[in-house]
Amino acid sequence: MATTIHPATAPSLDLDRIRADFPILDREVGGNPLTYLDSAATSQKPIQVMDAVDGYYRRSNANVHRGVHQLGNEATDRFEASRVRVAGFIDADPQGLVFVRNTTEALNLVAGSYARELLQKGDRVVLTLMEHHSNLVPWQLAAERAGLQLAFIGLTEDGGLDLSNLDELLAPPTRLLSLTHQSNVLGTVNDIAAITAEAHRRDVLVCLDGAQSVPHMRVSTRELGVDFLAFSGHKMCGPMGSGALWARPELLERMPPFLGGGSMIAKVELERSTWNTVPHKFEAGTPDVASAVGLAAACDYLDEVGMERIHAHEQGLVRHMIDVLDESGATVYGPRDLAIHGGAVSFNVADVHPHDTGTILDRLGIAVRAGHHCCQPLMRELDVPATARASVYLYNTHEEIDRLGEGIAEVRRVFRV
């Protein structure tokens, strides 16, 4: 099963205007204009987000949910308004939105407070072979501590999920399925709505890693039907240190707190405490209010540009990139069908280590990622130690894709391959 993403018919992006919003794109690297093709690792930030964070610190900085003074009330109002805004971006109930630092923390929260505490010894959690370590290691820890079993959905030859034995994997004792919406290595976009429907038919909950999808396409928790959704702000034009876990409020009610301290309590006695209402039960201590404000501003920015237009723009860039890489003789990993392909493309140049590829490209001002991309089991499945990865976003241009092709030619010249 794979999500069919129909090419959008929306007007093309005004790239000159968009790029003017990202000051870092004006800089040079090694005497060359910066060609930033690493947005799957982190996105660049528009001035609108920087201004929102700066404005909060300049005018409203205070601790939230505590003071009776005006600054405290303003900070609290902005923090809670940001929760509503971010929840709206993913078409979700704000009561289920917990602010966290990143996708990793969100997935650890689910693994620690749901799987480790509420599942029983012998219960099974199903993952896939394309998962980022952040959607693998927390489940390994939960399995070790709670006596859970882990099972894995394999891959097809073209980089999709092999769902031929899904019925078997979802059968008892499986209680939860946790998987990525979009692979950070292969770019594969999985058909989450169909998979979730099948899981729910078996009374299996679904936890979705949306780190690579929420920034790039319209994601609706109601349409996908998932029970948990984790994503990071820094990959979607928001500040580093911003992110969210959305969960069905009734699940958060059942789950014990992840961290203890101020804000997450209702009443504290010497021997025991009771907990605040959700989602505050999972937000111990002073939150990063500025990051929440910045993430809300990023949601505003992306919605103003238009998620459908962003996705259509990225599809055109990815098609161009795959063609350029093919023409250069590079090996490209992942699906060729744009209907199931996101904005990340992994590749290798024969007889050149990806770190060397990345180093040569960097000398030309081209920023790509090189390594295992926090996906060592997937690298073993692909039978490679590492790959180079180029990834696009709303601010990239076709000229930059051509520049990548010229960079690959330089890699071949330097290494005589």
List the model feature ranges, each with a label.
Residues 1-417:
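Pyridoxal 5′-phosphate
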